[in-house]
Amino acid sequence: SGEHYMEHFHHAGGVPKLMAQLGELIDLDARTITGQTLREVVANAEDVPGQDAIRSKANPIKSEGAMAILHGNLAPRGAVIKQSAASPKLLQHTGRAVVFESVEDMTLRVDDPALDVTADDVLVLRNAGPKGAPGMPEAGYLPIPKKLARTGVKDMVRISDARMSGT
């Protein structure tokens, strides 16, 4: 969410500067691996005049946070959505689930012309996260089925237990 890269974040003061901006929202008495408290780390945060990669709470990029926590029948213990990357029209959606049981299952079926899927359905990829796949592969990207893409579908609700980068 924003125009900057991680290197800009680093040069703007990095995690210590971000924690300084969070202030009372974090436990500043917690100890780090070095034995310092977060309060001590924050006190030593570099102040970089003119940087705009790390913004204050009073000057956010968006009025709502980039991330949100979801709860419901698909995620009874909670899930995370990067709502800043989601199409606003899809943030509230009801649809039929089209479930892929693994990355291999998805790869074999997602572009099959016989796949029973519509633009209003929800694509679900299971068993690709830390428990279902070895390690934590970046396997969370679910492509739009080709038969829908050919009709102009550019986005639809896609859910995965896998790690995703960027969006």
Go through the PLM ranges and name each one:
Residues 1-167:
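Catalytic or ion-coupling anion/metal-binding cores of large enzyme and transporter domains
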